[in-house]
Amino acid sequence: MTLRKLGAMVLAAVLAAGLLPAGALAARNEKMDADQMDIPAIIEAKDAEGTVNVYHWWTAGGEKDAIESVVDGFSNTYPNIRAKSNAIPGGAGGAMVMKVKVLQQAGKSPETFQAHPGQEIEPYLTSGLLLNLNQVWDYASIGTRALPGLEDLCTASDGNKYIVPIGIHKSNVIFYNIHVFEKYGVEIPDHENITWDEFWSICDQLAAAMPDGEYPIDLGDRKGWPACQVFEDIMMGTDPQIYEDFINGNYNVEDVTNVLSTYSRLMEYVAPDHSSRDWYETSGQLVA
């Protein structure tokens, strides 16, 4: 089953049986019991009518294409339902979260909206407006197909699932262009768990071989959050406990200073105009 088909099924499920005054991930200020609904029958009802709003923050490049593919898949499967893609730009969804909260308070909760798995969904539970998607998980056998640990992340504190995975976002990954290594005669390590010394050696070799205007590492952090994620990744890669202590205000100055030193050294290899570009612009340059 493709993500496009799964996305269409999810939107159908949250539409909740021919559009009750608005069944969905965020039912319009009306409490509903998803366990009493026949979600498989809802998914199979290809002649259902109505409108479903999809609020999200995927507005750039490939991510925009991805969400549009999901919405198009829904529209093709349920031609009598109008699917509206409502893009709210803003790094990592911050602006969209505020928009959803405003709509909820105004009694106009969207039928479905994007969210990260994990703790991000918890604040919405206090409103009692979320429709659980347990039956969707069962119907599509998502648990058996998801990456290890993902089902737990998508399970809320009350034991229900209010979110399904549509994409995969993973941090702490460095992408490299093999053609650049070949062009400048730098050997690509043939093993995992590369040490920092090995990484610095690679950066030094590339820096020495590259002409002016080219740099071993690139980063597009015009909106700030990519740089924050790099810092977090370095901290967690150094020692997960340092990260836990840091976010809980119990950090050790020496530990954090060492992390900052590593971060500072990494940035020495980054193109100086990194803060003028967005992440997707830099990604495009990497694969160009």
Please place each PLM-identified region on the residue numbering.
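Extracytoplasmic "Venus flytrap"/periplasmic binding protein-like
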Residues: 73-149, 153, 182-185
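Short, well-ordered beta-strand elements
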Residues: 48-60, 81-86, 112, 162, ...
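Glycine-centered hinge/linker elements that transmit conformational signals in sensory
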Residues: 201-205, 246-278
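Extracytoplasmic/periplasmic solute-binding protein
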Residues: 157-167, 172, 198-248
